[in-house]
Design a protein with these regions (language model features):
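N-terminal low-complexity, acidic/polar interaction/targeting segments
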Residues: 1-261
Length: 261
């Protein structure tokens, strides 16, 4: 498998391939990362790894997102591995997602506004805290390893994933309806949703209201079919629970929360 060493950005969130991640970068250790990434030619990938935190605390104070919930740039200059224990890799889930920063804009106060998109899953092999920011050696994690090992088995897995994808989309529409208290005509239509099973699996995993450990479990599923199968069970369970709860605000698949870091 292909390995690489990339900057590491820990979060109390899970990034999935194909999903957009807005970031407000305040801490010096992550500002240093963005300054270096910003020197990369805009036509070249500006890659870093987003990994969910298992233990320790997030790379920044997150609070409520109000102005005083984040530090003033330059006043929170912690060491790269500070807050993550003597062996930082133990604080992180071992499967993360490579992000490609399409936009890196430095503000007048030295903080950064970043817009990145998840690309591929990777497995953490090691973490280095000796530089100005964390880096990790990672290896690519194939989405459907069976397809690489055996053509016939891979085709069978793809057919299973396609069938599961249809069921997941139906269950997701029902989940949307219950979650939003919406009418059928206000739901996202099939034309608005992708037909690629792996894309469906990541979109649903990102959009569903689930905790970080559950989202992490979906990210590191061994293949698309396994992820879709688990999502189908989760959606059915969550929809049944929501039936007994008051209406909740509609979820918006086109927006993602901005993570202050």
């Amino acid at each position: 498998m292909t390995t690489a060493r990339l900057p590491l950005f820990p979060l109390n969130a899970v990034l999935f391939p194909g999903l957009v991640l807005p970031l407000n970068v305040f801490e010096e250790r992550y500002r240093a990362m963005m300054r270096e990434l910003a020197t990369t030619d805009e036509d070249a990938p500006r890659r870093f790894v987003v990994v969910a935190i298992r233990d320790g605390r997030e790379s920044a104070r997150t609070g409520t997102g109000m102005p005083d919930s984040v530090p003033t740039p330059g006043t929170d200059e912690r060491a790269p591995g500070e807050g993550f224990g003597p062996d930082p890799i133990q604080s992180f889930h071992r499967v993360g997602c490579v992000a490609d920063a399409a936009k890196i804009r430095e503000r007048a106060d030295g903080s950064f506004e970043v817009l990145a998109t998840g690309t591929v899953r990777v497995r953490l092999l090691s973490v280095d805290a000796s530089g100005p920011y964390l880096t990790a050696e990672v290896e690519d994690l194939p989405e459907n390893p069976a397809a690489e090992d055996d053509e016939a088995e891979g085709k069978s897995a793809q057919e299973e994933a396609a069938a599961l994808s249809e069921g997941v989309l139906r269950a997701f529409r029902g989940y949307q309806k219950r979650l939003a208290g919406a009418s059928e005509r206000s739901l996202t239509t099939g034309a608005d949703l992708p037909d690629d099973p792996s894309v469906v699996s990541y979109l649903v995993a990102a959009a569903a209201v689930l905790d970080v450990p559950t989202k992490q479990r979906l990210l590191q599923a061994p293949d698309t079919a396994t992820r879709l199968r688990e999502e189908l069970a989760l959606l059915r369970k969550e929809t049944a629970v929501i039936r007994h709860l008051p209406s909740l605000p509609a979820i918006d698949l086109t927006r993602a929360p901005t993570h202050p870091n």
